[in-house]
């Protein structure tokens, strides 16, 4: 089963601002979702997960019944959780 990846507007905006090397590395990590990488569920959230890509964090939700990974935000380690 292959998941469809949906990148929300705030995450896409962050990606567009990044240098090509960082952007490629983040996109490659996102393509491995939902099961590959340094992934942890976010405390206090039912279906929100965190993927670590170097100094960046990718926050996403899983919609297993629809086979959708929804990337809701991407940011630097200190800023993405705010």
Identify the role of each PLM range.
Residues 1-6, 13-16, 21-24, 53-56, ...:
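Enriched for short, Lys/Arg-rich terminal
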Residues 12-13, 48:
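Short histidine/acidic/glycine/proline-rich micro-motifs that form metal-
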Residues 28-51:
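A short, surface-exposed loop/turn module that caps and links secondary-structure elements
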């Amino acid at each position: 089963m292959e998941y469809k990846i949906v990148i929300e507007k705030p995450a896409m905006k962050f990606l567009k601002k990044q240098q090509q090397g960082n952007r490629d590395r983040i996109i490659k990590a996102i393509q491995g979702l939902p099961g590959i990488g340094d992934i942890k569920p976010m405390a206090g959230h039912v279906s929100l997960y965190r993927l670590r890509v170097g100094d960046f964090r990718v926050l996403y939700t899983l919609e297993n019944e629809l086979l959708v990974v929804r990337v809701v935000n991407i940011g630097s380690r200190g800023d993405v959780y705010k």
